[in-house]
Amino acid sequence: MLSSSLLLILTACQPAERENADLVFRYNEAAGISSLDPAFARNLSNIWAVSQLFNGLVELNDQMVVQPSLAKRWEIDEDGTLYRFFLRQDVRFHHDLSFSGSMGRPIRASDFIYSFGRIADPQTASPGAWVFNEVARRADGKLQIEAPNDSVLEIRLNRPFPPFLGILTMPYCALVMPEAVRELGQDYRRQPIGTGPFRFQYWKEGVKLVLRRNPFYFEEEDGQRLPYLEAVSISFIIDKQAAFLEFLKGKLDFMSGIDPSYKDELLTPEGELNAAYTAQIRLTTQPYLNTEYLGFMLNPASLDKGAFAVTDKKIRQAINYGFDRAKMIRFLRNNMGSPGTGGIIPRGLPGADTLGRIGYGYDPKQARRLLEEAGYPEGQGLPEITLSTTAEYLDVNKFIQHELSRIGIKLKMDVNPPAALKELKARAKLPFFRASWIADYPDAENYLSLFHSANFCPDGPNYAHYASQQFDELYAAAMKEADAARRAEIYYKMDSLVMEDAPVVILYYDEVMRFTGKNIRGLGSNPINQLNLKRVYKVRD
């Protein structure tokens, strides 16, 4: 139960409008939270909670620029393989009398050796183990990371890897308290001890999660210690329509994204906030580094017997040409997002196709011509193709199904629970599947890694089992290129090659949509939809 201290107002040293602030920020997480351990921060719901509790060496700001966090500065040697971080001296773990006394012990560089080694250890079974793939290994298989003293950390890479600093901003790379993890074991998932602006208070799974203000947090703003909020309260209402009604009643402060159940109630066809809600709600939008797409499994041997794999490039290209993405965005998403007429790299990252030169527009005549060249005029003789999706995206996929039927391509919908779809996709068991990729770090390599032959699932994110020697050679060249502009040129060539081979169908580039009450202040946003609450405060209406 929340204590009465949550009703206290902020101290008088705050700006005047903050003095009357309510101190609890409330949001709903329909998808649930499975773990508060950074080792398992693989989805947005876990990431948002973990990000309030933990810090890493570095972090991203709203402009996607890497900033200091627990490291106050860093150096990279000339050959790009040695990263040296100089740690802050004023950071302590959350206080827990079982491990660290009333204030929490200071952090040490050796804590990072433990934290990173734990992610890379196969026994941890972290889905984020791949983030340290480029770190050199010792003869015993451990990461080549040194702590010359308590305030200096050195990380040695196998080869130059320009995206590495961005990778270190991911929650997988957060600092955990070694003695707490050792003592708690698997219970650390629900009893986390970090260094973040909020500390763990209470969690009844599926009902309520409460985080409390960390009174010893190291960051300040305008001479005042962050965060401004006293607590964060997270509910787990599964029904998104019910959660929306709670938001309208003022019982939630924030919603991200929009569900078809209330889309037309809240937004105009042009994607603006309906006039009935402008006095009550604030809508903020920006491009989202999230590419929504359909993927083909190009390796028939992995599929179950009888499944039809679309191994003919001409058929895949025909599907790409066979539906109107702009119409789909306009009518099914109220113009929230932009049509996927470019490559896999979303706009906003260097290397992206901003002019639609390498992707696919709506061209049914070209689609029919390609089908005829493939030996299936008007689709005659072409087997039915099974498209696996989830209920949330069924409207979009039914639109594509209808559009493709007009040129002779028959799709069969296979609706799965999200977890089941993810598992089948990772095991290469789906011939044609809905997917999306949200940037883990601000580098186009993150998207192009989906097509590197070394990343075949289940060991990596190449869910299509796409393989191209030319692509792999370009990938290797990009990783050796220190100049960002020249590296972006290589990325563009790689994206062009992928789109020509068409292992995917780009649907649209998403948009961050945030709905807040008019009393919320200080809630920023960035293109990967991070939730940063350390500067948030509330004012009375």
Feature map (PLM): residue ranges:
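N-terminal lobe/hinge region of extracytoplasmic solute-binding protein
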Residues: 28-79, 117, 124, 193
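Aromatic- and charge-enriched surface segment that lines or borders ligand/interaction sites
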Residues: 73-125, 154, 243-246, 309-312
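A structural "hinge/loop" feature
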Residues: 31-50, 70-71, 97-101, 162-173, ...
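Surface-exposed binding/hinge segments that line
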Residues: 111, 118-177, 204
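Structural transition elements
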Residues: 198, 313, 339-374, 393-395
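Detector for C-terminal structural segments
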Residues: 162, 204-208, 281-292, 318-353, ...
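Gly/Pro-rich hinge or "lid" segments in bacterial periplasmic/extracellular proteins
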Residues: 150-151, 159-227, 231-233, 241-242, ...
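Extracellular/periplasmic solute-recognition and catalytic clefts
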Residues: 201-212, 235-302
